[in-house]
Each structure stands twice: as C-alpha cells, then as structure tokens.
C-alpha cells in the first residue's frame, strides 16, 4: 500500500478490510462456536444415570453452561491481576495460545435438587482475531504495540509457538438428497442394486448422520444409517408406517402421486407405471411381518434396537423406537410428519433414477458440496469427547458400586466428585489441542466424516502469499489422493466463480487442492451486521413468503400431486409444500427481488435453486438453502432496474442465465435473455492468480506455475520480523513494488509484503551461459544489493526439558571459567548479538549445579552465521530457563540460485557477469540487470511478460504505475466512458514509449561490452518484476569424497546433514551403460562405493564358508637393521572342503556378500565359478 507523505505513516484498518474478508469464514465459525455453538451442543448431550440397587437411588449427571475464557498469563501471585496473553509472547516462548474452558457438571439424586459444580476442562485453543483474542478490535497502532503486523488478519491457532491453520475440507451438501450410482451399493447384501439416494443430515449442533435409501432389484427399498460403527438397514415401508398414523392407502397415494396418465416423459413426468407396483411391494413387506399399525411398527423397531442403544434398557419398546427415529433418521428435522414427507420425496427421486426419468447427481460437483469450517469440526469433536467423558464417569461409578470392599458412599456427593476426578476433565482441552497440532481425529464413531487425518497444516510464512493461500485453500479430502481415477480431480463447470481454475498445484494434489476465487465466500451463522442468525425465524419468514406467493403447504391428509403439474419446494431439507409449475418462475423472480432489497425478510445469501422439469434431466424441484458452510459469490441482477448485487450459490448457478461483461449474449436466443451478469471477469480466479499481470495473454500452464512459484518466493514475509521466533524465515532485503500491477495489489494491500524486484531484463543470446532457461545476472547489480536476502533460523533451548524430576532447576545459563571462550559467550552464558559464529563453535553455555560441569551447545551446519537476536524467558525461576537464539544466514545471489518472473519463466543464475562486459545502450547508458535467452518465449507463449516489459518501461519514464488487470478488452467501460477501445493494448503501451523517444515496440540498440561495437540486431529490453525463489544452492549443494558408510551394506550413507553422498540411481547407471563407459561405471558402483576383498573357495564356489587359521611364525634368525618384524601370514581355509588349496581372493561389492548371507538364511546356496583372465576354470 502506497502512503502519501501528508498521510499518517500508520495505515488504518479500513485499508485492510478486503484482506480481512478473505479469512472471515474461519473466524466467524470459531466465534459462533464460543458464543452459541457450545450451548447448543451441550443441550444435545444426553445425561448419564447411575443406579444403586442397594439404596435404590439414581444419580443423574449432565453438563451445562460452557464458558471459554480469553487467554491470560500465568500468575504466580494469588493477589495479582491476570494480564492478557499476547500472541507474540506465545510464539517466542513456544507455548500455546489458549484460554480456560469451564463448564457446570450437574448432579441430581432421583427427583431432588440439582447441584452444580464448576469443572476445569483444560486449556482451549483460541483462534487469533476471534472475539476471545486479545487482538480483537485493535487498530493498526495497537497491533504495532502488540508486536504484530498492521495487516494481521488472524484465522489461525498458535500451538507450542507454531502457527497452524484449519484446512477447509469438502463435504457433501447438508440436508440435500443426492442420487448416485455406485457399484459398492450392490455389495451390501444379496438383491441390492447400484442405485441409492444419500442425504447427509446435520443437526443444529453441526453433528451429522448420513441416511441412505438403497434400491432393491425386486422394486423395494431399504433405509440405512450407521450406529456405533455398524450400518442398520430397515424396510422403507416399516419406517413410513412408524413415522405417522397413515393407512396403507394414504402411503400408496403418496408414493404414486408422481405418476399421472395425463403426462408423458416428454412433458417432464418423473414417474412411471412401475411406481404403483413398487408401492405395493413396499406395503406387502410390512404386511408380511404382521405389522398393521404405527404402534406395532414402533414396537418392532424397539425390539431390534433396544440391545443396540445405550441407556434404554428400562424404557418401553415404543420409546426406544422413538429414540431411533429421532436420533438417526433425518436428524435435521424435529417433526415426524416432516420426516415422512422427506422420505416420500426421496423414494420418488430414487424411483425416478431407476426408471431413467432423471439423471444421477454428481457427488464430485461443487453443486452438491459444502465446506467443513473449523468451528463446526471442533464442535462435533468436542461433543464426542464430552460424551466419552460422561460415559467414563458412569463406568467409574458402576465399578465402585460393584466393589464390595470399597468405602465409597454413593449418597455422598463429595465421594462422587472425588471419584470423577480420577477421570481428569482437563484431558478434554488436551484432546482439542492435539487435534489442532496433528490434524488427526481420534474417534471411534468417525463423526460421519470422510477422513480422520489431515485437518490442520502448519501455516508457513515463507512469504505472505503462501500464508494467505492456506486460508483460501479447499481440499477435496485425503481419502481421494490414493484413488486411481481422475474423476474427482476434473475441473467441472459448476465450480465457475467459486474455485479458481488456475490456482492448483501440479503433481499429486492437482485438482484435489483448490483455492477459492477472489469474490467467493462461505456463509456462516452471522448476518452482514455481525448478529447471530435465528434460522427458525428465517425459515418461518421464507415459508410465509412462499405461501403468500401461491405455495400449497405440506399438511397431513392433504391430496398430493407431483411433477410436472406441481413441483416440490424444499427449504434446508424440509419439504415445505408444492408450487404449480406455472407459478414457479414468477415466485423465483419475486424471491430474488426480495433478496436484494435492504430491509428484507429474506436473507441476502438464501440459495434459490430452481430445477425445471425436463426430459431425463435433473430431478425437478425448488431447493432453498439458508444454512451455513455454503459457497456464495456476488453477481449483478440486471432483471431489476437498480442493478443490485445478489449473492448466489453453486447449486442455483447451474440453472441461471448469467452473462459475462463482454456485452454479448453468449449464444442465447431472445426467449432466454440473461437475468444476471458477472461483476468482473477476474472474479473467477483467486487472489494469487489475480496478481499475474495480463494473465489472459499467457498460456494457462504458465499461470498455474506462477501461482506455485509466487508461494515459493523469498520475500518480505512479515513486518514483525524482529519479534518472531520461527524455526526458519526467508527475508528479502531489498524488495520493491512492481511498476506493472493489477488492481488486486491495491485492493488487498499486497505492497505491505512485497515479493520481488524490478530488474532491467534484456532478451539476448549474449553468451553460451543463457541456454536452457539459465540467466545471467549483472555482477555489479548484485553487489549493490539486488535480490539480497537472509535466512533466519531460531534455536530454542529449554532447560526445563533437560532437567530430570529429581534435580529440577539445577541447570542454568552460565559461562565457563575457561577464558579462551569468553570472547564467544557472554557472562550470562549466551552469545552476544551481532557475533559471527563458524561451524562447531560454541554459542551457548549450560552449567549443571549437580555435577558442577559446564556443557556447550555448538553451532551445526557448514556456513558461518550472525547472531541476530537473543531472548530469554524468566518466568518464576531465579535464572532463565528458556532462551531463543536467532541466527542470520546471508543469502546473496550466487550461481545456481533460482529466479522467476511473474509469468512462470523460471531459471537459474548461470553467471555473475561483470558490469563492464554487459551490453549497453549508447544513448542512455542503460545496462541490463539480467539477460535471458529469447528461446524462452516461443514455446511458452508468455506474451504478458513482453507486455510487462514495454509497460514497465513506459511507466518508469512517466513516473506512474501501469494497470495490468487481465481481460481489459472484455470489460465494459462505465462512468460514461466508451465501451471498448479500438486500439490494441500494445499500441497503447507503445505510445507511452514514443512520447519519451523510445522505440514503439520496446527494442533498443545496444553496444557490445567487449568490443564497443553496435550489435547487429535490436534488443528487446525493459523492466520486469522478478522473484527470487527459495531454492538456493547454499541450502542444497551436496558433495563428499569420503565419509560415513552404512554399517549393514558398507555403502555411503544418504542425507546432506549427515555428510552423505548423492544417490547414483538407475537413470545414472543407464546413461553410463548407453555411453559404454564401463570403467567409469565400475568406479562409481564398486570402487568408490562398497569395494570389498572376499575369500572364495574355488572348489565348492562358496563365499560364506571361509575362515582364518592362525599360523605360528618362526623366530627370525637375524634381524635386518632396526626394521620391525613382518606381519604374520594368514591362512584361509574352507570349512566345507576342509582345505585351503582352492582359496582365492576376489574383489566384489560388499552388498553382494550381504545378498549371499540373506539368501543363505532362506536355505538358498549361492555358488561362484572362478576363472583366470584367459577364461580357464580352476
């Protein structure tokens, strides 16, 4: 962000508003969890009861009033007031940013008085910038005082000093019936088909139960759901009769209403005559079980589920059946009548899929997906851990009651609390912290999630763009990474405007790890004003609006009808009524008009998915969604004169007419004109992809590469560098703001963390050192500071970890008495700031009071470092027990370091060329900072890089930035300007150069730096924004002559840190074989690897049966001078042949001897045939 001289040097929070909006879905989900989500979840946790048969007393235990406190510092004085804990303190002290989690544990004997007691459930991790964070509401000046960057946006956790972000994972769309065809459905049981309708039902506490309706080949269906790791399958007719008091005729008519003799398939009918036969089969199955009434069906269910459910052994069978239907069947609905209507709708959709009157839904399409946000996953995981804790408390009480020798008194609440404390409640907070540290869910039920690991990742601050991408990333799921099929990786049209088609990595995670577009957002439980929504009130308002517009509500005993005469209306998975097909279009337009009105009863992010009737298309209906965790994005509603902005979702987008802002009609006829319009074409790509200037002029793979290389750039990662203690930080010493820039740079304040340098680039085949993407750097430019950088590494020394429990606090930082080390280490035992350290030099001294000895910590590595920063943590100890020592590595550009432009043109530095030998302009005296080969452009087709060079030259000459936002010619001009310009972009840029006397196309006449003569051709030269990547030779070079070898194979070990060698693999072997370099091959794989002299018996050919026999040496008759006596000759014999006549010495790789030993362990004998050079066998 550029700050004018007259303005304050400190920006305001309004400057970072758009940047903070990018991580809103992380923070709002956590805020809702702490404000209301925990209360809702606690209400869903069932109490546990313990019965004492001796006293006939029953004790009930449940949880209430959860409360998470803001992070506070540990206070060692009981009277002192606790101070808020700041995030930077956690980073430096390597502790977690957590607050205390308290809750009431309620006890009640029989029908007596409820006794509440506050329990400490441990430390709960707090998300930065949430309402419980110390930085919430802080302006830029306060953030600076708190030692944070002014652009700090939060959305992550700090655990043991490490920043971790919760990864957004794709999940099936909640409360939406999805029809699909899978071969795995056929393998359930005999008679099952591959067709089913799957519904992921989510409660208000975010826990979910997936209900599947399987189609059987005999025409019937089965309802399936999971209970404690096992799937239970019920006849669909049994469930229908157990839900309501409907008779067989009413159920038959409800199922058959989707078929009418007056409508054919061409009219959009979804039912056939086979529906009648299937309805009879469903009812006959129930009748064959001898079940005729609702009560009989419920008792039948209760009889089978009473042994399965916990805590219902004493309940009646009807109550058990009610618990099953309430807790496992369509749990998002609280009314049995609503569950009955939804099940009827799902049966009709299943039969439509079977009869091929509708297509199956695509579970890999964003249309049928939503996001698992951090607050929701933490809530459901916390719920399971609290339920396990209650069950463990119940088990402890039962075991104590069964123990006849125990002095435990069940009537004494003090004894009960004492026993419960054996099951430490603080483990609850530890389990949540472990989840965020490892990203793994330790659950027995699976929580109805598709994966149990990979939910959190470390938020690396290699540069700001990499850090930002963690919050915008959307992962398909770890379980899909191992699939051989590429279906889940495909870029589907439904994701237009929601997922970026460019910003995805190449390689294994390609298509699985995507990123949200610049304008895409995730809905939450908060409205636009920051108030928590009342979803019951919202749904009631929507139903009232629909009823007033002509919808017929779904009431019991009401005559039903189906498509195409009427279509069903579903609101958040509830069938609320039906609409006449003639009214649907008008009702949809009316709802959209209410959405964009400011004071509206309809929420602004309501998804209005109207699926019209068609011949064999998607199943028709009006699907409304107001729930959280959905994708939304803004578009213009041009059907309303005021051009209001409307928020739409991926489900409704497929069936809408949205035009792009190029003025055309997109091939539409006059009867289906567009009702909506895109705000800007760049809204379909991510923030990182938007930073590429004129990306529409590049080949798409180059834009993909740039998205990855922008996140590997050595840049200005953070403003609070001096207060951070990260394990490794890359820092660019002389960053610059690009001259050619898109509007995204200003919108999201990217200039607060620049990523590169404006270098003068000449496209010239000047020497042989620029072939194959190599580049030549101007040596003088580098010496003056171009692309200079550092790597900061922090060593954390914690003496409390080194102390044993017997001599706690016996170690301290203290300098030894050896005066030779005083110039390296200060009196406090720590190094002085600014000191230069070489490898194996001590930088820290630790004194042990028990042994009275001093131990030194020595510098590891191969290059010298500078001590940049030293911090200590005093705590309550007399001496410091923890220290952070940050080292600074100089990383100036050298040969082999990697660079790239913003267009995917990457290469390594091949030479640092002297400035006097570089080509120069005879008029301006300008010499390039960087030379690249012209062969880099034709095959890559990065035209935008050429445009950037011309534009940056013109912008530098005129002293202004150049707007390089892509899709320039496709955007309509507003504010009274012309709709499009007739001139080309290159002509507009060339005119800027012409005004200053330069060539229209950016070429210049250069002179040779060697001879001083004019080069024959004109050279294309201009400023290009170049990025220095983190891949540097100083961190990767590996060479050795001799060193450690593996004890087992005697081959060189691997690993750069261990002084290992470089692997000579199959490809290297094949290349030497192809060249016929047999001697070199022998040297690499034998002589210089694991050369070994072995004794082999030529008689039996054995390698493993040789042994050494000691021979007595005869006494020397006369010594020769003062020479020592010779070595005793050894005699080698063969155990198998009992002779030493055939023993020969053979040179071989040692791993060959190891192979012979391994084969011998499996009773496989290896025999060698020895021969001399003439080929004669011994």
Curated annotation (Swiss-Prot):
Transferase keyword on record: yes
Domain of life the protein comes from: Eukaryota
Primary location recorded for the protein, binned into one broad class: nucleus
Entry-linked SUPFAM superfamilies: beta and beta-prime subunits of DNA dependent RNA-polymerase (SSF64484)
GO MF term set: DNA binding; DNA-directed RNA polymerase activity; ribonucleoside binding; zinc ion binding
Gene Ontology CC annotations of this record: DNA-directed RNA polymerase complex; mitochondrion; nucleus; plastid
Gene Ontology biological process terms from the UniProt entry: DNA-templated transcription; megagametogenesis; ribosome biogenesis
Keywords: DNA-directed RNA polymerase, Metal-binding, Nucleotidyltransferase, Nucleus, Ribosome biogenesis, Transcription, Transferase, Zinc, Zinc-finger
Zinc finger extent (C4-type): 1097-1137
Compartments where located: Nucleus
Mutant lacking the gene: phenotype: Defect in seed production due to female gametophyte developmental arrest.
Pfam name, any one: RNA_pol_Rpa2_4
Entry function: DNA-dependent RNA polymerase catalyzes the transcription of DNA into RNA using the four ribonucleoside triphosphates as substrates. Second largest core component of RNA polymerase I which synthesizes ribosomal RNA precursors. Proposed to contribute to the polymerase catalytic activity and forms the polymerase active center together with the largest subunit. Pol I is composed of mobile elements and NRPA2 is part of the core element with the central large cleft and probably a clamp element that moves to open and close the cleft.
Subunit structure, as described in the record: Component of the RNA polymerase I (Pol I) complex consisting of at least 13 subunits.
Family (UniProt): Belongs to the RNA polymerase beta chain family.
PANTHER family, per database record: DNA-DIRECTED RNA POLYMERASE I SUBUNIT 2
Full protein name: DNA-directed RNA polymerase I subunit 2
Lineage: Eukaryota, Viridiplantae, Streptophyta, Embryophyta, Tracheophyta
